[in-house]
Amino acid sequence: MNEVKCVFETKLSPGDVAKLNKIVGAVVPVARCTPLISPRDVGLHKHVSHRTDYGKLHMALNMMYPTVFRKLEGNQMVMTPMQHGNIYTIRNTGPFSWEVGDRLAIIPPVFSVEHTTIMQTPSWDLMLPIIVPVQVAKEINIRNLVLTLMSLNRPGRDVELSQEVRRIHFRDVTIDIPATLDTRQLNSVRNVCLALALITNVAPSLLQQYVPRLALAETDMLLVKCYDLLKKLDLPGDGNGGEPPNIPNEIQRMSGLLNLITYVSSIVTENSLFIVNDITPDNKMATCTFTL
């Protein structure tokens, strides 16, 4: 399928036409990737509450299909679904500049819902996500987790510290992410804490068992330092009590530990959707390879 068309039920006003023509090249998420869709399937509007729930928007965005808005044709938006490995010219709708070689991720609007709301009607708003370098997306996810965790044991009036955690500076831009608290974010914090507790419980015995062997086999200074640190820890036993290792049990423990580490990483890591190949002088448009 080469095109997805969003058909408007009523004639667009000249003002709306002008607004849409200004965002040609924008990445527009759609709920259904079919030849004809309605406005309610386009953008993030139906997932936005008065509290601008970032967790809810993030989850919804991950379930949608990214398209590129190509043109306005009569009373309909014409969009192109993206395919892995293809090259697209996309618009920078976020606050941060891009550079050639950047890997870009798509995230919900985090600095101003109004800024990413392109047009408004009585029944529907066109709200777009923002495209940022993956390191920015990762930092935003980390800060959201930190803010949520801090909110559990700090008073709401602790503004100064909150603002410090909320502020993100990248290249020549500084933004403040919203300090909202929602149940999905709390679930993420709870699950991360559980995973870290299990990692803390399982990792020491595995490290105590295998790092000394690696230190004997290798002369790498990092391994030697790890061995020295482990000798200072007050750990019970010697890893397996002198008994031959139970292979199935060892595999289960190692697999479980690595899965937990992978889970913690997945909470904050964003998938790279684009690699920037070329950028216009004003940094508003870029030619990118779609990598998802």
Curated annotation (Swiss-Prot):
GO terms for cellular component: host cell nucleus; viral capsid. Its main location: virion. GO terms for molecular function: structural molecule activity. It is found in: Virion; Host nucleus. Keywords: Capsid protein, Host nucleus, Virion. Pfam families: Herpes_V23. InterPro entries: Herpes_capsid_2. The keyword Disulfide bond does not apply. HAMAP family: HSV_TRX2. Belongs to the herpesviridae TRX2 protein family. Structural component of the T=16 icosahedral capsid. The capsid is composed of pentamers and hexamers of major capsid protein/MCP, which are linked together by heterotrimers called triplexes. These triplexes are formed by a single molecule of triplex protein 1/TRX1 and two copies of triplex protein 2/TRX2. Additionally, TRX1 is required for efficient transport of TRX2 to the nucleus, which is the site of capsid assembly. Interacts with TRX1 and major capisd protein/MCP. This is Triplex capsid protein 2. The gene is TRX2.
